[in-house]
Amino acid sequence: MKNLIAELLVKLAQKEEEAKELTVQVEALEIVVTALLRHMEHDAQQALIQDIEQAIDQVTPCPPVNDQDAMLLQQYLKKLLRHPRS
């Protein structure tokens, strides 16, 4: 029983480490996207945002994702593109 608990704790620690790495990657990408958007002229920025939003609207995920996950992705993209980090 102790071995099982120890194994579970090790797996949990690994998952937490993976989650931290993903969080850092997402934050780094947010910073890069924000910097790129800020260095673009307004018209080019708006055109890029519209292209991204249209591409997201046209994509059909395979395998299909649930509506809540799709909505979460759309909300996050809108926040990132329309209201970038300060």
From Swiss-Prot:
GO terms for cellular component: cytoplasm. Residues 1-38 form a coiled coil. It is found in: Cytoplasm. GO terms for biological process: cellular response to starvation. It comes from the Bacteria. Keywords: Coiled coil, Cytoplasm, Stress response. InterPro entries: SigmaS_Anti-adapt_IraP. Interacts with RssB. NCBIfam families: PRK10244.1. Inhibits RpoS proteolysis by regulating RssB activity, thereby increasing the stability of the sigma stress factor RpoS especially during phosphate starvation, but also in stationary phase and during nitrogen starvation. Its effect on RpoS stability is due to its interaction with RssB, which probably blocks the interaction of RssB with RpoS, and the consequent delivery of the RssB-RpoS complex to the ClpXP protein degradation pathway. Belongs to the IraP family. This is Anti-adapter protein IraP.
